[in-house]
Curated annotation (Swiss-Prot):
Primary location class: membrane
Annotated organism of origin: Methanocaldococcus jannaschii (strain ATCC 43067 / DSM 2661 / JAL-1 / JCM 10045 / NBRC 100440) (Methanococcus jannaschii)
UniProt entry keywords in alphabetical sequence: Cell membrane, Membrane, Transmembrane, Transmembrane helix
UniProt topology in membrane: Multi-pass membrane protein
Subcellular location: Cell membrane
Name of the protein: Uncharacterized protein MJ0131
GO cellular component: a single term: plasma membrane
Origin superkingdom: Archaea
Length: 103
């Protein structure tokens, strides 16, 4: 269960992303930052697949799966969610509601 520090950092990040997303360059940065954790998890965990196929151990696979789910949920909640929510709020605050503009 995430503690007080986790949610404090989450709220601070959210406020920073809302502020950054009111500018065009801030929206681009928020978009890129929000997609980077998915790439990081992909690069980290695909290295384990050859090991699992060479040594089909159920415990190894169960540990990998549980670690992946826990790490993925914390990483996404901590890095991706504030930037994307901040991006949406920043678009609304700046009056730029055309989403294709950020890409």
């Amino acid at each position: 269960m995430p503690g007080v520090i986790f949610w404090t950092i989450f709220i601070i990040q959210f406020m920073i992303w809302v502020f950054l997303s009111t500018t065009k360059i801030g929206r681009v940065i928020a978009f890129i930052w929000g997609t980077m954790p998915f790439l990081a998890l992909y690069l980290k965990y695909t290295g384990y697949f050859p090991t699992i196929f060479e040594n089909p151990d159920v415990n190894l696979f169960a540990n990998l799966l549980s670690n992946f789910v826990v790490e993925w949920s914390y990483l996404v909640v901590q890095t991706t969610v504030p930037s994307w929510i901040g991006l949406l709020f920043g678009l609304k605050l700046s009056g730029n509601n055309d989403t294709p503009q950020i890409i």
